[in-house]
Regions:
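A glycine-rich phosphate/pyrophosphate-binding beta-strand-loop-alpha-helix module
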Residues: 90-139, 144
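Short, structured segments at the rim of ligand-binding sites
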Residues: 27-30, 44, 50, 55, ...
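N-terminal glycine-rich anion-binding loops that anchor highly charged ligand groups
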Residues: 1, 10-53, 69, 282-289
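Acidic, glycine-rich active-site loops and adjacent beta-strand->loop/helix elements
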Residues: 83-86, 113-117, 222-223
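Active-site cofactor/substrate anionic-group-binding motifs, chiefly glycine-
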Residues: 49-108
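Short, glycine-rich nucleotide/cofactor-binding loops
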Residues: 30-31, 79-90, 194-197, 278
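Glycine-rich anion-binding loops and their surrounding alpha/beta cores
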Residues: 9, 15-16, 58, 63-73, ...
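Short glycine/serine- and small hydrophobic-enriched flexible loop segments
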Residues: 43-46, 101-102, 292-300
């Protein structure tokens, strides 16, 4: 009966403050609520209707309970979320992971194995030889030796992963899908990527990222675009402890490009990425820009100008 009042407020859409939301989400993650109470909470809160305070409450509850992959001291990783929140994210997530690993930047992709809105990053990475890790210890070892790993959401927290899995039954994204984007799956303060599209529920990520300590590289595509559109650069921002810096503005229209559009299936995407990595296909400009932003964020360059130069020179060498 402890949370009856909070649940009643949610059903009436009287928003909870952050502390109350953290207590309620904590109870959910601790399996202290029964199925009827859980259903009431999830019925009242979709990804688009949850307030910033309610999302921050879930973030706090998840952070306190999640497990993390070990990372060697001094190694700054990039964490890439892969939860199917943004259609087409698998292409950009997988390509970014492959490119960053070339720079010896550890990349921890974390998310779901199958996406309800198209090909999942896990499927593309599997075709690239990156298999889902069976444990966080193995994930840490992969980060050390291979510089890239895929961490299933289940390893970070079984109960949190079960909230994400409910999308298949509810038909809509819940608050967990948004919060998953800003989680750090490592124990060493990774730079976190976030993907969002203007005019969708994912747009709340910009506000959420500014409320959380740590570093983010936030990508926002214009309305109607997606990460699979390699002819349109998203707005790319660096967010450091809530302070925002625009690194690249979004393209207002599609760029003309001779780069062939990748296939839409996992095997085809993986083949296309392999051709990019082999220099047979030029690195798309949005991907070069993203790499530059990440190199800047993890400290692989003393300033952003040099980060852009390093990324551009590397892209040119691949194509040479």
């Amino acid at each position: 009966m402890q949370f009856v009042g909070d649940i009643r407020k949610l059903l009436q859409r009287d928003p909870l403050d952050e502390d109350a939301a953290a207590r309620l989400w904590g109870a959910i993650l601790d399996e202290a609520l029964d199925d009827i109470e859980l259903g009431a909470v999830l019925g009242a809160l979709t990804a688009s209707s949850a307030t910033r305070e309610e999302l921050m409450g879930l973030y706090r509850a998840a952070q306190e309970r999640m497990d993390r992959a070990p990372l060697l001291a001094g190694a700054r990783a990039v964490a890439i979320p892969a939860y199917g929140l943004v259609p087409g994210e698998a292409l950009m997530a997988s390509l970014a992971a492959a490119l960053l690993a070339r720079f010896e930047v550890p990349v921890a992709v974390h998310g779901i194995l199958d996406s309800p809105c198209g090909v999942s990053s896990a499927c593309v990475l599997r075709e690239l030889g990156v298999l889902p890790c069976a444990s966080l210890a193995l994930a840490g070892e992969s980060l050390r030796t291979e510089r890239i790993t895929f961490i299933p959401a289940q390893l970070l927290g079984a109960r949190f992963a079960s909230l994400i899995a409910l999308r298949g039954r509810l038909g809509v994204e819940g608050p967990a899908h948004l919060v998953a984007q800003v989680l750090d799956p490592t124990n060493a303060g990774a730079v976190r990527l976030s993907f969002s599209v203007a005019g969708t529920a994912s747009e709340q990520l910009e506000t959420l990222a500014t409320q959380i300590d740590g570093d983010f590289v936030a990508l926002t595509w214009p309305a109607g675009r997606s990460p699979s559109s390699l002819s349109t650069r998203p707005r790319i921002e660096s967010i450091r402890d809530g302070s925002r810096e625009v690194l690249f503005e979004a393209d207002v229209q599609e760029m003309r490009t001779a780069i062939p559009q990748p296939p839409e299936d996992a095997q085809g995407m993986a083949r296309w990425i392999k051709r990019v990595m082999a220099g047979a296909i030029p690195v798309p400009v949005p991907a070069v820009n993203l790499v530059a932003a990440c190199l800047y964020a993890v400290g692989h360059a003393p300033d952003f100008t040099q980060a852009k130069a390093i990324a551009a020179v590397s892209a040119g060498r691949l194509a040479a």
